[in-house]
Design a protein with these regions (language model features):
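Membrane-embedded transmembrane alpha-helical bundles that form the catalytic cores
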Residues: 2-657
Length: 658
């Protein structure tokens, strides 16, 4: 009997050790059964902790008493730390360090700001110093772990050195504990560091601006920073949106519960059925060896990847929104059907909305926004010039980039009427370049961000032009590309792709001009709804195609060893562009039957994506209103279908390593 009890105790001990053990090969992902077992236990504990915290029936008290709030938020803070430890190991210490640092610095910022206001001053130098210290610490941590190899590559390229990156933090840790516990020859990127550093920067900045009061309790602030559903891949939550929720009572209606379940199922479907299946069965094969596939297959893989990255990232966000809602917290919308966008500018109002707003609030506007340029603008122009030098390996290109920037500023100074537009475009371009670099430490990400910036600027000019002017300008571009195509060069494939794209736009503009002339000769506009719908469809197709080709640089720069990311990413991108622009010997009709499931799934996914938003809201509400037994049956059927698509090896979320 004693032996049996000992065996049981040993099993319990091993089980508990396994729960709190970190396995780098098995992080807690939303698509793993282990996570849902983890969440079931967490939600059970949360229900016990928050069960007595419901709003009373009269609704008189919406806020929690202090000790109950601390109990609930402290519980979720500790659970979030456990989740991050299971996902990223001892990097949980880094998360705690950032939390403690910004908690105390924000309190200091608020204290000195209030003293300045009481003395009749608008600003406090000490508060500004603490803000700069907070931003320096947060960005310093981010740059060390994410951009060390990138910066080392720049230094080596410019000065011809052979500087090697070593893990200083690991070396220091080994020295403290007195033994070689951590590897010092490689810097590992902590999961989600790009998200939570930006989140705490926005918090201290908003405290400095007086937009929010600092959180008084470290457990409340820690919960805000580390809330596990959105910790590793966003959305980036503004303090003013989330902190007030920390003090509210837990309340979850029957309809809200149904909506939460719908978001979770919707996210799992996007991730497993759409994203992972397309990646494993087609996209990854082509991107791994683009030279083995035809131009059509490379092009199809590029369009499929454009949908995959949306399904992957928005799928994570949907699950995060659903999990948060079940616990009574609301996360902001991060995607609004981005491939319905009719131009690049509108796309970025629909895609990764939380990041777009962060960049606008904390980068674009401080640079001067649409009014002026600042010292920061000139600083980043110099940085971009250096980046151009690294990309091309030629001083001539760097000089050209700098000359263009100077010519743009001189033009703005000599043309007061256009000055604000020019400054706005400069600041917008810098914002997009840095937004691209936020996604990854590779020049390809900067190219991706720069292309999006160019697309936004071109649209601003395009929207001001008459149809005839659009035709004339596009005709010039087509002629130039045609002449470049006749000149044999390594960029022949690029000229071919651009020529096809611009020729499509030109033909479309000519048809539109003829249609407008035809209707101008009549007393009424014929088929106005058809004309409007056609124009919308055309704009969506052009925008989707443009965004898809920028993804070439996004995909080729992802999931690479930081030490060789620049060279590898560039080789993948150029190889795919070469195949797309020149290799069309294989008949597309012979390719489609071989991958018919992939093409069918892509078409179904895009069709669902393009469903009008009012219809999506309607079927979400209908699902939420289903009787509970019927909802359980629908969920069971959906889960059964979803896990028919599960691959042997689960695919990590694309944004998991940002």
């Amino acid at each position: 009997m004693t032996i049996e009890i000992q065996d049981i105790l040993i099993l319990i001990k091993e089980y508990l050790l396994n729960i709190f053990a970190f396995d780098p090969n098995s992080p807690l992902l939303f698509t793993h059964f282990r996570f849902w077992a983890f969440f079931a236990v967490v939600f059970t504990g949360f229900s016990i902790v928050a069960g007595s915290l419901h709003k009373n029936r009269s609704g008189a008290r919406l806020h929690l008493p202090g000790w109950r709030r601390v109990l609930r938020n402290g519980y979720l803070f500790l659970i979030s730390l456990l989740f991050y430890y299971k996902t990223s190991g001892l990097f949980v210490g880094l998360l705690i360090l950032v939390t403690l640092t910004d908690f105390f610095l924000a309190r200091g910022i608020y204290r000195f700001r209030q003293k300045a206001i009481n003395k009749g001053h608008e600003k406090s130098k000490m508060a500004l110093f603490l803000l700069c210290l907070s931003v320096t610490i947060d960005l310093g941590i981010l740059c060390y772990f994410k951009y060390s190899y990138f910066f080392a590559d720049i230094v080596n390229q410019i000065f011809g050195t052979n500087f090697q990156v070593t893990n200083i933090a690991a070396r220091l840790g080994n020295h403290i504990i007195g033994r070689p516990f951590w590897s010092v020859d490689r810097i590992v990127l902590p999961v989600g560091i790009s998200f939570y550093t930006f989140q705490v920067i926005s918090y201290t900045a908003d405290v400095y601006k007086g937009l929010v009061r600092p959180v008084r309790n470290i457990l409340d602030f820690g919960f805000y920073v580390s809330f596990f559903p959105q910790l590793v891949a966003g959305p980036i939550i503004k303090a003013s949106d989330f902190i007030p929720q920390l003090y509210r009572r837990y309340a979850l209606s029957r309809t809200q519960f149904g909506i939460a379940v719908f978001w979770i199922l919707n996210g799992l479907t996007k991730k497993i059925v759409m994203s992972d299946y397309l990646a494993v069965n087609f996209i990854d094969r082509v991107f791994a060896n683009p030279q083995l596939f035809s131009g059509f297959e490379n092009l199809a893989a590029l369009f499929a990847y454009s949908f995959q990255v949306y399904a992957d990232f928005s799928g994570y966000t949907d699950i995060a929104i659903g999990l948060s809602l079940m616990m009574g917290f609301y996360l902001p919308q991060n995607f609004n059907s981005p491939y319905k966008a009719q131009n690049a500018r509108n796309f970025w109002k629909r895609w990764h909305i939380s990041l777009s707003r962060w960049l606008q609030t904390y980068l674009y506007i401080p640079l001067g926004g649409n009014r002026n340029i600042s010292f920061g603008t000139w600083f980043w122009i110099c940085v971009i010039t250096i980046a151009a030098l690294i990309l091309s390996g030629s001083w001539i290109v760097a000089v050209i980039v700098l000359a263009i920037a100077l010519a743009t500023v001189i033009t703005a100074l000599r043309s007061p009427g256009k000055r604000r537009h020019i400054y706005a475009n400069m600041n917008s371009m810098i914002t997009m370049l840095l937004g691209g670099l936020w996604h990854g430490a590779s020049c390809n990400f900067m190219i991706w961000g720069g292309l999006n910036g160019v697309g936004m600027i071109i649209f601003k000019f395009w929207s001001d032009w008459h149809t005839v002017k659009r035709i004339i300008v596009t005709s010039y571009v087509v002629c130039i590309l045609f002449l470049l195509r006749l000149w044999a060069s390594p960029a022949l494939a690029l000229w071919n792709v651009l020529l096809c794209f611009c020729a499509f736009i030109l033909v479309s503009m000519i048809i539109k001009c003829i249609w407008q002339y035809y209707n101008s000769q009549r007393d009424y506009v014929r088929w106005p709804r058809f004309a409007k719908a056609t124009n919308v469809v055309w704009s969506v197709i052009v925008t989707f195609t443009f965004i898809t080709f920028t993804r070439l640089f996004f995909r080729s720069g992802s999931n690479l060893d930081p030490a060789v990311a620049n060279e590898t990413a560039w080789n993948i991108a150029t190889s795919m562009m070469t195949r797309i622009g020149t290799e069309w010997t294989v008949n597309p009709l012979d390719v489609i039957p071989a991958y018919w499931k992939v093409f069918l799934l892509f078409c179904i996914g895009m069709a669902i994506h393009w469903i009008p938003e009012r219809m999506k809201r309607r079927y979400r509400y209908l699902f939420a209103k289903l009787p509970l037994p019927l909802m359980v049956l629908v969920c069971a059927f959906a889960i059964f279908i979803i896990y028919q698509f599960v691959t042997a090896e689960m695919q990590p979320f694309i944004y998991f390593q940002l």
